[in-house]
Amino acid sequence: MYFCKRNLQNKIITYNMKNLKTIIFTACALFSLGAAASTEHTTVQGDHGKLDVVIQRPDNDAANDNGSQANAKAKAGKKTPLLVLCHGFGGNKEGKLFDCLVDSLNKKGIAVIRFDFNGHGKSEGKFEDMTVLNEIEDAKCILRYASSLPWVSKIAMGGHSQGGVVTAMTSGQLVAQADKDIKKIQAVVLLAPAAVLRDDALRGNTFGKMYDPKNPPAKIEMWDGKALGGNYIRTATTLPIYETAKNYHGAECILHGDADRVVPYTYGQRFHYLNKKSEWHLMTDADHGFGGQEEQAAHIASDFLAKVLK
């Protein structure tokens, strides 16, 4: 386990042949595991407990680590670019969109670290204690860990939905206040970034759950037994999303669907307006999760990262 400095088993997927939906959903996951010859599970100490982490490296890296001595010598000193991938609100590091992205990146020689934020997936912490701000701290812990890996060359960040907000704000913060233990963020990918979360909190409506934004309750019951803490709402109403994100002026790729009913695409487009070096991809008929277009979104993002990082 890696402990971040802070001031402030391979899993076999089984499915029922009668369940076509599950087969389609897991297809990219199977391809991803096949393409990533080296898959490592670990934990990293985050802001609110240990974070569950999966590192997936391309075939050439596995050969360098596990191949013949002659081959290892030939590849000695070769390093690999890496993407740190952040999931959205109430989600986790799994899912077809991320599986397709990992598969596409591994094929292009780029490694990926994906992880569960505090209170999500297999990571420690309570969901009701989660805020965007402590997710930013989680992301920085992962970035410090990634920066410490001897085989990593360049680092990029990417995120979907709230993970996109975390990515945008983290990359902006690290420009305004550099961290000596974190390598420079060379590229950013935002997938349907949910900057609407601040406006939702100000309206007193988060995923259909109504409340008084001026006096939020201690917690709000959401789904699957999860409760959203009042501190999430209080911090969200004053979250300087765009004000922080605008500090990052490096390579950036922003993807959004014009059929997104969770986060209108104009919220993603505003990130594009803030950065002259950014690419803007508005995908026709794509929803918030890019359902049915996951592979297309993954190829756009991976082509961009291959161009910037290799």
Where are these regions (language model features)?
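N-terminal cap/lid segment of alpha/beta-hydrolase-fold proteins
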Residues: 37-67, 72
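The serine-hydrolase catalytic nucleophile loop
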Residues: 90-102, 117
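Short beta-strand element of the alpha/beta-hydrolase
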Residues: 78-88
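Alpha/beta-hydrolase fold nucleophile elbow
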Residues: 150-161
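The alpha/beta-hydrolase serine catalytic core
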Residues: 51, 165, 170-172, 181-282, ...
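Short beta-to-alpha linker loops that shape the active-site pocket of alpha/beta-hydrolase fold enzymes
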Residues: 89, 116-126, 194, 286
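Conserved alpha/beta-hydrolase
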Residues: 102-124
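Alpha/beta-hydrolase active-site loop
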Residues: 129-149
